[in-house]
Design a protein with these regions (language model features):
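Short helix-to-turn junction characteristic of helix-turn-helix DNA-binding domains
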Residues: 17-21
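A short, conserved structural fragment
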Residues: 51-61
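Short, hydrophobic-biased segments on the C-terminal half of alpha helices
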Residues: 44-48
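Minor-groove-contacting beta-hairpin "wing" of winged helix-turn-helix DNA-binding domains
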Residues: 61-68
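Short acidic, hydrophobic short linear motifs in intrinsically disordered regions
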Residues: 22-32
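Short alpha-helical segments that sit at the start of domains
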Residues: 1-16, 71-72, 83
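Amphipathic alpha-helical dimerization/coiled-coil segments
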Residues: 78-116
């Protein structure tokens, strides 16, 4: 199973890509300088790392995602539930709601999701 853990800085960089894709790698380097205060070499190093993880691709200088942000978050969540709760979604939900009271709207939304509506 691939590992979908990103550090805080990697996640900010991934957000930049998702918000601007497809994007030329040179343009991404300029955006990273502006938004993250990164040098070009830092941008390319982190980009390569995220490409090696299978999240993004850089083909002929054009950067785009292999995983949408939503799919990436789903895979992160699955990995977390598997590692922390032995894959038990009910155990995860029980732990979550024991710390946070859900509103009626949230409960109804969860019911719709579970029922596939």
């Amino acid at each position: 199973m691939a590992e979908y853990k990103l550090g805080e800085i990697e996640m900010k960089f991934a957000e930049l890509i998702w918000e601007n894709e497809p994007i030329q790698s040179g343009e991404l380097a300029l955006l990273s300088l502006k938004e993250l205060n990164w040098k070009r070499t830092t941008t390319y190093t982190v980009l390569k790392r995220l490409c090696d993880k299978g999240i993004f691709k850089n083909e002929k200088g054009m950067v785009s995602s292999l995983l949408s942000k939503q799919l990436f978050q789903a895979k992160q969540s699955e990995e977390f539930v598997e590692g922390t709760f032995g894959g038990s979604l009910p155990d995860f939900v029980a732990a979550f709601i024991s710390q946070k009271k859900l509103s009626e709207e949230e409960i109804e939304e969860l019911k719709r999701i579970i029922e596939g509506k």
